[in-house]
C-alpha cells in the first residue's frame, strides 16, 4: 500500500510541477478522495484537507484532474512566515513547508516500522506533528518562531 501511494504521489507531483500555470508562491495537491491508487483512510484524507483549508498559508483552492486523478490544488503564500523565520539568529533554515501528503506518508512509514511517538523540531506550521496525530502517534511539535507558533495555534484551534 505505501509503495503504491508513494509511486502515485511522485507521479502527480511531477506532472503538476511540469504543468502548473498559476503564479502562487506555494502549491499543494491532495487527492480528492481515496482510490485504488491512493489507498488512504477516508477520515485521514478529510483531516489532511481540513488542515489545508484551515491553514492561513493557503489562499485559494480548486479541483483539478492530474494524470486522471481528481485532486484539490491549494495555492498560497508563505512570504510573511518565511521572512519572519530568517530574523532569528538561531534559524538555520527559513520556513518552507513539506507537502502535506509527504508528511502523511513519512508518518505512515514511521508507524509501519513500529514507532508510536513523533517529535518535529523546527516544525513550522505543525503539519508533520498533525499527520502523526492523525495516525495516533504521541505527537509533539517544537517551534521557536513566535509567528509560526501563532500559525500552529490557529490551525490547532480550527481543526
Outline where the language-model segments fall:
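Active-site catalytic pocket residues across diverse enzymes, especially alpha/beta-hydrolases
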Residues: 110, 135-136, 156
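Conserved class I S-adenosyl-L-methionine
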Residues: 114-124
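Conserved SAM-binding loop of SAM-dependent methyltransferases across substrates and taxa
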Residues: 125-137
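Short, catalytically relevant binding-site loops at active-site mouths
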Residues: 124-128, 146-149
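S-adenosyl-L-methionine
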Residues: 2-113, 145, 149-159
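Conserved SAM-binding motif I beta-strand of class I
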Residues: 138-143
Amino acid at each position: 500500500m505505501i509503495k503504491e501511494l508513494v509511486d502515485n504521489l511522485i507521479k502527480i507531483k511531477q506532472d503538476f510541477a511540469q504543468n502548473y500555470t498559476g503564479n502562487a508562491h506555494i502549491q499543494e495537491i491532495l487527492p480528492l478522495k481515496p482510490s485504488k491508487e491512493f489507498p488512504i483512510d477516508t477520515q485521514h484524507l478529510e483531516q489532511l484537507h481540513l488542515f489545508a483549508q484551515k491553514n492561513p498559508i493557503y489562499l485559494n483552492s480548486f479541483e483539478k484532474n492530474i494524470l486522471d486523478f481528481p485532486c484539490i490544488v491549494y495555492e498560497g503564500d508563505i512570504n510573511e512566515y518565511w521572512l519572519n523565520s530568517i530574523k532569528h539568529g538561531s534559524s538555520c533554515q527559513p520556513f518552507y513547508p513539506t507537502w502535506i501528503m509527504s508528511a502523511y506518508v513519512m508518518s505512515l512509514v514511521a508507524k509501519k516500522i513500529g514507532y508510536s511517538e513523533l517529535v518535529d523540531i523546527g516544525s513550522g506550521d505543525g503539519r508533520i506533528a498533525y499527520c502523526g496525530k492523525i495516525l495516533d502517534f504521541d505527537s509533539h511539535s517544537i517551534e521557536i518562531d513566535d509567528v509560526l507558533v501563532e500559525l500552529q495555534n490557529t490551525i490547532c484551534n480550527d481543526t
